[in-house]
């Protein structure tokens, strides 16, 4: 009985130690994305502050659509060191292991349109960072739909900040 209680306490202590650190306080150190300590912490490839929607759309080209994506998962977030002849074989088959989260997969994306102002004589510059605070990506124009897919991937996207 005494062994099981100490094993339980040790297990709980190991769980607490393994938890990721809590979120930093608002405005404190570490609350930004590492580029001037500003913005969303989930944005890996930031874009310049003075880039407009028109410039970003031109960078994407005519074969891709400028999009704002709420979620992005990048490969290389985890690293597993496997030893032995068949070390890691099962984990690689079931989809875990190094880079298991994908190769820059973007999810929950919405289209960013270039809005033409009503008054043509007044130049209005829509800054891309004002339109989208999440991941800005160039998504391939394709008629595919991922609504009822098993994998759920419809549009291959590339982070805009990675091609600048």
UniProtKB/Swiss-Prot annotation:
Record's SMART domains?
Answer: HYDRO
What is its induction behaviour?
Expression is repressed during growth in liquids, whereas several days of growth under aerial conditions of solid culture induces expression.
InterPro entries attached here?
A: Hydrophobin, Hydrophobin_CS
Q: Which UniProt keywords apply?
A: Cell wall, Disulfide bond, Glycoprotein, Secreted, Signal
Q: State the signal peptide span.
A: 1-18
PROSITE patterns in alphabetical order: HYDROPHOBIN (PS00956)
Its main subcellular localisation, reduced to a broad class, is secreted
Q: Which locations, inside or outside the cell, does it occupy? A: Secreted; Secreted, Cell wall
Read off the Pfam families from this record: Hydrophobin
Organism superkingdom: Eukaryota
Please give the residues the UniProt entry marks as glycosylated: 50
Q: List the disulfide bonds.
A: 60-138, 68-132, 69-109, 139-157
Which Gene Ontology MF annotations are present? structural constituent of cell wall
How is this protein annotated for GO cellular component? extracellular region; fungal-type cell wall
Annotated function: Aerial growth, conidiation, and dispersal of filamentous fungi in the environment rely upon a capability of their secreting small amphipathic proteins called hydrophobins (HPBs) with low sequence identity. Class I can self-assemble into an outermost layer of rodlet bundles on aerial cell surfaces, conferring cellular hydrophobicity that supports fungal growth, development and dispersal; whereas Class II form highly ordered films at water-air interfaces through intermolecular interactions but contribute nothing to the rodlet structure.
* Family as reported in the entry's similarity comment: Belongs to the fungal hydrophobin family.
Q: How does it assemble?
A: Self-assembles to form functional amyloid fibrils called rodlets. Self-assembly into fibrillar rodlets occurs spontaneously at hydrophobic:hydrophilic interfaces and the rodlets further associate laterally to form amphipathic monolayers.
Query: What is this protein called in UniProt?
Result: Class I hydrophobin rodA
**Which organism does this sequence originate in?**
Penicillium camemberti (strain FM 013)
Q: Lineage in the entry?
A: Eukaryota, Fungi, Dikarya, Ascomycota, Pezizomycotina
């Amino acid at each position: 009985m005494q062994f099981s209680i100490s094993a339980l306490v040790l297990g709980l202590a190991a769980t607490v130690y393994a938890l990721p650190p809590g979120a930093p306080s608002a405005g404190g150190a570490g609350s930004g994305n590492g580029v001037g300590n500003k913005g969303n912490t989930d944005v890996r490839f930031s874009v310049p502050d003075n880039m407009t929607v028109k410039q970003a759309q031109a960078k994407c080209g005519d074969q891709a659509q400028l999009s704002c994506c709420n979620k992005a998962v990048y490969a290389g977030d985890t690293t597993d060191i496997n030893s032995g002849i068949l070390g890691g074989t099962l984990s690689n088959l079931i989809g875990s292991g190094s880079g298991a989260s994908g190769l820059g997969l973007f999810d929950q994306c919405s289209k960013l349109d270039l809005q033409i102002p009503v008054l043509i004589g007044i130049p209005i510059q829509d800054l891309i960072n004002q339109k989208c605070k999440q991941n800005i990506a160039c998504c391939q124009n394709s008629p595919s739909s991922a609504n009822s897919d098993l994998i759920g991937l419809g549009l291959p996207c590339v982070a805009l900040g990675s091609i600048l």
